[in-house]
Amino acid sequence: MWLLLQLVWLCFLLSLGLNSWHQSKVPEYPDELRCGLRSFQFTINPLSQETETPPVLVAWDNHGLPHSLQNDSDCGTWVSEGPGSSLVGEASYSGCYVTEWESYYIMTVGIERAGVSGSGAFIETKLFKCPVNLPDVPNAGLCDSVPVWDRLPCAPSPITQGDCKQLGCCYNSEEVISCYYGNTVTSHCTQDGHFSIAVSRNVTSPPLLLNSVHLAFRNDSECKPVMATHTFVLFRFPFTTCGTTKQITGKQAVYENELVAARDVRTWSRGSITRDSTFRLQVSCSYSASSSALPVNVQVLTLPPPLPETQPGNLTLELKIAKDKRYRSYYTASDYPVVKLLRDPIYVEVSIHQRTDPSLELRLDQCWATPGADALLQPQWPLLVNGCPYTGDNYQTKLIPVWEASDLPFPSHYQRFSISTFSFVDSVAKRALKGPVYLHCSASVCQPAGTPSCVTLCPARRRRSSDIHFQNNTASISSKGPLILLQAIQDSSEKLHKYSRSPVDSQALWVAGLSGILIVGALFMSYLAIRKWR
């Protein structure tokens, strides 16, 4: 019997060692992404220089199912070993694992790495995102030809290579100024309605006279360069100044301006000459005429009298998704789409925007999810019904109290809840629908805050009604972007194409089988010994 106990204990220890592969914490690691003209080009580095095993890559298709990422010309993927146990990969924008969302190509990659000194394995999902219309990124010659002492910062550090390239600038992670302008003309339009134009003196041959470069229609003090060096001149000005013209073409609002450079002309009694290049640059920015990011002409006048304590006005709401249950940080518009595994928690916050009346209390009426940005799109799934969790869900929505002791200025202006992520299912084919999931809520404001009439009571059991009815005097709000929900590798119930099961799983099965044989054998030997003794 003592031998039997030893065998059982040995199997238990082996199982703990194998299970630690699933429980390790994911560390930080440096990786690189380059947005090519036709494909993602990325490098996945090992966790440590001491690690000799390269990471293992997994990609998810449009149905949320995982596949081993390997060389596959049909799916447009190529993977090879790089220096120092790293992996170099490429994925075509038109391949099996890339989705076009708004103005970006997106791809989710799962990375399994071996820990330092064989301490276990780590898995993390990584979202690759590249713009559909890439800006004109300067080539290596235009970047390397700028001396270090003449480099003009394009964006403050730290900045990723992808973000720097989106600005059309040069990138070198080993320099103090990692993102800088190349020897060309670099222009971009900001979301707050400004032109940003950098001109290199070497954009023409012979070089420009930088001190003569100016806006063609206005040369006021506010229209002069904001920065000038021996090699570069930088202009930054609003669309509403410096002679900028505006035209509405269809659904597009186009803002245009022009830069010119004077020439040094030498004159004598019999003629004039110049050795300078002709330079005339027209820049334009296009915005959707219906976009909320469209710049507006704002005039600053004398301050109006203070607003009364209570006044009628439009109800403006904001729906945000927090990065963790503490609600310390939130996903911004640039973070979408947010990638989550099925059943992962999503922490939602709805708040009253731009109101300072402490007597207001926000009440959530209905909250629901759709597979598209349209709040009325079908199918739908209820999250909150009349302010209470929908009881027809086996993973019910959880209401999260906003305490008075929180650091929020007006706690009654906030409502929070969490949901477990899910995927919509085709009611006919009984298969998970591909595509994103959007969240929506309708809400109203109650006064005075804290009174019984402003409190929503949720009984233990409610009628399973999933109909969404909008009440009068309510406002609706939607998430800033979609959620992409993936099927977990370990939970996949379907046979995965091109994906082999983890060697750890096969080892676990082998240990379990061997344990069973040893236990049965030990019991049988004990039985024979007892029978012989009798």
Curated annotation (Swiss-Prot):
Q: Name one GO biological process term.
A: binding of sperm to zona pellucida
Q: Which residues cross the membrane?
A: 510-530
State any GO CC term.
egg coat
Q: Name one GO molecular function term.
A: acrosin binding
Propeptide boundaries: 462-534
Record domain ZP: where: 188-465
Q: What is the recorded post-translational modification?
A: Proteolytically cleaved before the transmembrane segment to yield the secreted ectodomain incorporated in the zona pellucida. The N-terminus is blocked.
> Which first-to-last residue range defines the signal peptide?
1-17
Q: List the disulfide bonds.
A: C367-C441
Compartments, as annotated in UniProt: Cell membrane
| Annotated keywords | Cell membrane, Cleavage on pair of basic residues, Disulfide bond, Extracellular matrix, Fertilization, Glycoprotein, Membrane, Receptor, Secreted, Signal, Transmembrane, Transmembrane helix
Q: Can you tell which superkingdom this protein's organism belongs to?
A: Eukaryota
Primary localization class, coarse:
membrane
Name of the protein in its database record: Zona pellucida sperm-binding protein 4
Identify the species of origin: Bos taurus
Lineage, uppermost ranks: Eukaryota, Metazoa, Chordata, Craniata, Vertebrata
